[in-house]
Amino acid sequence: MTIHIEKETEVNFDFNEEVLIKEVIEAALDYEECPYETEINVVLTNNEEIKEINKEYREIDAPTDVLSFPMVEFNEPSDFEHVEEEQEDCFHPDSGELMLGDIIVSVDKVFSQAKEFGHSEKRELGFLIAHSMLHLCGYDHMEEEEREVMEERQRAILDRIHLSR
C-alpha cells in the first residue's frame, strides 16, 4: 500500500497525524474488504486553499472540511469485483496498486470542528479520513438512507482503531 501525505500548511497536532491517517486508511480498506494493494494521496491544507479547490470543482465558494476525488467508478459501493475487468486503467502501471483517489483535508476545519463537536482533533481528523475513504470506495450521502449507511460504516471503522466519540 502506498499512502502519499502532503502538507501544504503548518500542522501542529499533539499526535502523529501521518500514523493516524495510515491507520484509518488501513482500517477502512480492511472494513470494506478491498482485495488490492492501493495507492491513496492525502493533502493537508488550510481553509483558503480548500475553498479554492471547492470553488473550482464543486462551484461552492466556501471552505469545507474534506474533499474526496475518487479515481474508481464503482457499480455499487465497494464492489471491487468488477474493478479489475472494467477499469484496468485505475491500476498503477508500475506498482500494480489500485489508485483509489485523493483526499484533501482542511487542518483549520479539523481544529474548529473538534472544538465545535467537543472531541479531540485526533478524532476529528480520523473521522474525516474515514468519511473520505468511504467516498473513494463509492459511497455517497445524497439520500437519507445513504447517509445512514455511511454514518454506520464510519462508526465501525473508527471503532476498529478505538477512535469513537
Curated annotation (Swiss-Prot):
Binds 1 zinc ion. GO terms for cellular component: cytoplasm. Its cofactor is Zn(2+). Signal peptide: none annotated. Keywords: Cytoplasm, Endonuclease, Hydrolase, Metal-binding, Nuclease, Ribosome biogenesis, rRNA processing, Zinc. PANTHER family: ENDORIBONUCLEASE YBEY, CHLOROPLASTIC. Its EC number is 3.1.-.-. Zn(2+) binds at H131, H135, H141. Belongs to the endoribonuclease YbeY family. It is found in: Cytoplasm. This is Endoribonuclease YbeY. It holds the Pfam family YbeY. GO terms for biological process: rRNA processing. The lineage of its organism: Bacteria, Bacillati, Bacillota, Clostridia, Lachnospirales. NCBIfam families: rRNA maturation RNase YbeY. One of its GO terms (molecular function) is RNA endonuclease activity. Single strand-specific metallo-endoribonuclease involved in late-stage 70S ribosome quality control and in maturation of the 3' terminus of the 16S rRNA.
